[in-house]
Each structure stands twice: as C-alpha cells, then as structure tokens.
Amino acid sequence: MLSLLDAFSVDAPVWSAEELAARCELPVSSCYRYLKSLHQAGLLARVGSGSYVVGPRVLVLDRVARTFDPIYTVGSPRVVALSQETRFSALLSVLYSESVMCVRQVLTPDAPPGLSGRGQQRPLVAGATANVILAYLPRHQLSRVFKRHQERIAEVGLGREWDELRVTLADIRARGWCLSMGECGTGAAGLAAPLFNKDGEVLGSIGLATSMDSPRLEELKALVPEIKQAAAEISQGIAANSSLVDLPARGLG
C-alpha cells in the first residue's frame, strides 16, 4: 500500500486511482481500497478532479524529521555557517534507497541551477556528495550497487570493472573527501566529505557547490580542510548526542 506514495513527485504531483493502479500493476479495486486508507491517514488528500495529492500528514512527519533527524538537527547550523564563511552553496545529504537525498540546502546568489533541495534525490553514483558516501559503503552493499548501476558507474568515471571501482573509492577514503566536476548534468562542481555515526558507519555527506564556469572554482578546490573539519564536527555532534537516533545509512536494498 505504501508503495503508492512512491509515485508522487515534483514532476508528477497528482494521480488518479486508475493511473496509480496502472503504474503499480494493481487491480483498480485494490488501489481504491489503499487510497481510502492513505486518505484517512492524511498521507494523501483528494482534489476536485477526484485525483490525489500528498496530504497534510506529510507536513507533520517532516516537522518530526526536522526535530529528530540527527543530520538535520546537528548539521544545519554547521552547514549554514560553512556557506556563510566560504560564500559557496552548501548541502547536507543522506543515503536513501540507492540514492542521495538532500535534507538541508543553503543557496548563495551564484548557486548553480538545479542544485538539490530538501527531499530531492540524486543518483548514488554521480557527484561529490554521492561518491563520498559510496566510498564508505560496506562491501556487500557496494557490490549490489555495482551490479545494478555498472553502466552509470562507468559513465561517470568511477570504474568500468569491479576492481577499478574499488581502487577509485579507496582513493576517496584515503583522502577523506571528493571533488566532482559536472557529473550530475547540472554544470556544477562539488566538494564533499562524509558524515558518520558513533560506530563509524556512513550516514551522509556535507558538500559545497558552485558552477563549473565560476571564477571562484579554484577557491572551491582549496577548501578541503574546511569541508573535512565541518564533517568531523557534525559527526562528533551526532555521536555525542545520545537523544538522537544515529542509525546507519538509510535502507539500501
């Protein structure tokens, strides 16, 4: 039933029961039953055409997430400060279902177009904020990602073979940061470092971004100490706050 919610996005915010049934390969009668339950729970709302949009309960859940998500609560003040100090746009991201999802965005006037906003997902195999998370995945998770996205991994230059990918990611781990140039197709350059919980498991990343044609591109490349320090401070804050749930990286299955 909850898989129906996966259909709703910025690009496709309104769905009819028939459209959802076709998309999810469900009998229309079952789809109507699921929609009734989701509507009663406030997760979906009906609009004038009889179609459905995301409901008000989602706003309640988002408020809860902003209050208790460790990356958001600990990382938000630091990512704002980092953007102000460097005058670059900044992002906090988490691993979520074979993608990287932005949980906090701070934009500067010269922000590259198409930079991720809160709740927006990007492929796990493109861009500094994604690659620096990929580098710290356990071997069994990384192997699954490689098998499912081998062509994309090769396209962005991470490696055509399994051993090549492992060498590339080992280099990222040795440095503790990642720089990318235009991998997400947005014309953006990014610099990112990983975030960890108290057990050393990767939770997400903090990143800075600018346009590839920015006159300040070399300044971005020189901010490795700053991005690593910010990541370390956030990771330490997560580990030190026992009232927050610092679970391992979101489901990768």
Spans of features found by a protein language model:
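Juxtadomain coupling helices with adjacent low-complexity linkers
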Residues: W162, T168-A170, R175, L179, ...
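N-terminal helix-turn-helix
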Residues: L2-F68, Y72, A232, Q236-A240
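An N-terminal domain-start capping segment
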Residues: M1-W15, V80-C102, D110, Q229-G253
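Short, basic/aromatic recognition patches
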Residues: V74-L82, F146-A192, G237
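Amphipathic alpha-helical effector-binding/dimerization core
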Residues: G50-H149
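Sensor-regulatory modules in signal-transduction proteins
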Residues: L195-K198
